Structures are given as C-alpha cells and as structure tokens.
Amino acid sequence: MRITFVCTGNTCRSPIAESIAKKMLVDDTINSRGLFAIDGQSVSPESLEVIMEHNLPEPTVAKQFSEKDLNSDLILTMTDMHKQQLVSHYGDNGRIYQLSEYVGEIGDIVDPFGGSIDTYRQTFEQLLYLIGKLRTNS
C-alpha cells in the first residue's frame, strides 16, 4: 500500500509521521507532503531531533502535494482543514482522510512549529499512537 501523510509545510508533522510509518509499516511505501511546502526545504531541526532520538529513518525533504500524489492508496492529513482543502481542490476520491478519523479517533494533530522540543515530543507521541492504531487496523 502507498500511504502519503500531509500537513502544511512538510517540515514538522508529516515528516515525523513518515519516519514513524517507515519503521512500523515496513511493507508499505510511505511519503509525506505539504499543502504549502517549499520543495527541497529541510525538515525542522526539532522534528529531526525527535526522529533521531527514536532511531527512526530520516524523512525526505519537503515536497508540495500535487495531483500525482492522488495515486496514493491512502492520503492521511494531520487536520480536518488539510483534508477539506484537498477534497475542495482535488475532489473526494475516497482515499483522503484525517489520520485520527481513519483510525477511529477524534482531533487534529497539533502543529508544533515554533514550540519547544517538548512540544515536538508531544506531537511525536500523538503520531506514534495513531500510526500504531493504523498498523493494527491494516
């Protein structure tokens, strides 16, 4: 299965999700994208620090979501707003979900941008929990 995680800039939440999923969902192809990403931008230092603390695979550099990404089997967004923006722009293809919604939970993944390293660690724990449920459900 090809899974694409989506956030705003593809430098904080979705790269963390990508790294966790690459470790947990080894039989799947994992990508991350941003709705307003600057192609080639590095992952935030704090996100990278949290990823390295857990010895996870390093994520790819930022890449903006494009029509090609609609070929993913599953597109999982960090917030309901991200989901709504994708559906509004590309239509509802039945494969776009908010991550928490897809695994039977409620709520957005908090954007840690501009926060302390502890905020990034909290985001990591939230994503670890949800992706753990994703693995269990797949």
Curated annotation (Swiss-Prot):
Transmembrane segments: none annotated. The active site is at C7, R13, D111. Pfam families: LMWPc. GO terms for molecular function: protein tyrosine phosphatase activity. Its EC number is 3.1.3.48. It is an enzyme of class 3 (hydrolase). Signal peptide: none annotated. It catalyses: O-phospho-L-tyrosyl-[protein] + H2O = L-tyrosyl-[protein] + phosphate. InterPro entries: LMW_PTPase (IPR050438), Ptyr_pPase (IPR023485), Ptyr_pPase_sf (IPR036196), Tyr_phospatase_low_mol_wt (IPR017867). Dephosphorylates the phosphotyrosine-containing proteins. This is Low molecular weight protein-tyrosine-phosphatase PtpB.
